[in-house]
Regions:
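GGW-centered surface loops in extracellular recognition modules
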Residues: 51-66, 162-165
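Short, polar loop/linker segments at the starts of domains and inter-domain junctions
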Residues: 72-91, 208-214, 270-289
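Short, surface-exposed loop/helix-turn segments at secondary-structure junctions
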Residues: 242-252
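Intrinsic disorder/low-complexity segments
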Residues: 1-50
């Protein structure tokens, strides 16, 4: 009698009573859910574009901020943060960090711009900067890099079509700070986590700190919360949001104060919120002002 080789028969697993066996159909369903889960995780960052940086001749990298719309202001914030309104912002470039003393001194040598800072250090943010000084530095940096300056230093008017450096508009600043978020801070609304991204009154030990030590926001920008408050190009008006343009707003036509954003090493967690606004005279006429807590960062139009 001829022997045949035994070949075991493989059959699909089926559910047997309460033993918990799983059928082929159920395996396929589970596999589908797993695949869907991976796709969902992959898409969680769809609204947070990959960080695209641009090197500059002056040494501070810039981040390409994508065009888009966002909800500006805060429903639960101070009166000058209301009403919340939808704003469209064109793409632009923003310094990855606050302006450092090293770069200020590099460019300032040829422009008679001495370092005004109270706390000294190459990697520290420059501070004790008036608005006119910040605008003048933007022009100096533009010339240093062969770009067209934006500011008329006699009138403080800004040429937004020039390809040089300028201060961000208030809308650009908040849009970049939020980095796609709609919460109190770029990372959420839990102020207890602010120390992960910011130097503020609770952790700064009464001084500024080297830029870029804390976590960046989703768009790769450092110290948008805390360290030093940052000048914006706009004139401050506590009621401006009631009449603000909905596309690339550039602030009121005139006023006695300019906008500061972001809070500082002296600020509370509340003052470091993304929507928090502060108006200050551009030349530091207020004797009570914390001057060593004010700096800036530059932006450029995206070409």
């Amino acid at each position: 009698m001829k022997r045949t080789q035994y070949k075991p028969r493989i059959t699909p697993i089926t559910r047997i009573g309460k033993a918990g066996f799983i059928s082929i159909r159920e395996i396929r369903v589970i596999r589908g859910f797993i695949l869907l889960g991976f796709l969902v995780l992959a898409c969680l960052g769809c609204n947070s574009p990959a960080v695209n940086t641009v090197a500059t001749k002056s040494g501070i990298d810039m981040v390409v901020i994508p065009a888009g719309s966002f909800e500006m202001g805060s429903k639960s914030g101070r009166p000058d943060e209301k009403p919340v309104h939808t704003v469209w912002v064109d793409a632009f470039l923003m310094d990855k960090t606050e302006m450092t003393q090293a770069v200020w001194e590099l460019i300032g040598k040829a422009e008679a711009l001495p370092n005004p800072s109270h706390f000294k250090g190459a990697a520290l943010p420059v501070e004790q900067v008036t608005w006119p000084q910040a605008a003048r530095f933007c022009n100096a940096r533009s010339r240093f890099e062969g770009l067209k300056p934006c500011y008329n230093e006699d009138t403080a008017e800004c040429d937004f079509e020039a390809d040089g450096y300028r201060l961000p508009t208030e809308a650009e600043w908040e849009y970049a700070c939020r980095a796609g978020s709609a919460t109190d801070y770029s990372f959420g609304s839990d102020g207890r986590k602010l120390g992960d991204v910011a130097w503020f009154v609770d952790n700064a030990a009464k001084k500024t700190h080297p830029v870029g030590q804390k976590k960046a926001n989703a768009w790769g920008l450092f110290d948008m919360h805390g360290n030093v408050a940052e000048w914006c190009n706009d004139v401050y008006d506590k009621e401006y949001y009631q009449t603000s343009a909905d596309k690339n707003p550039r602030g009121p036509a005139d006023g006695k104060e300019n906008v500061l954003r972001g809070g500082s090493w002296k600020s509370s967690a509340d003052a470091a919120r993304s929507a928090y606004r502060l108006g200050e005279t551009p030349g530091f006429s207020d004797a009570c002002l914390a001057r060593d807590a004010i700096g800036f960062r530059c932006v450029r139009k995206k070409i």
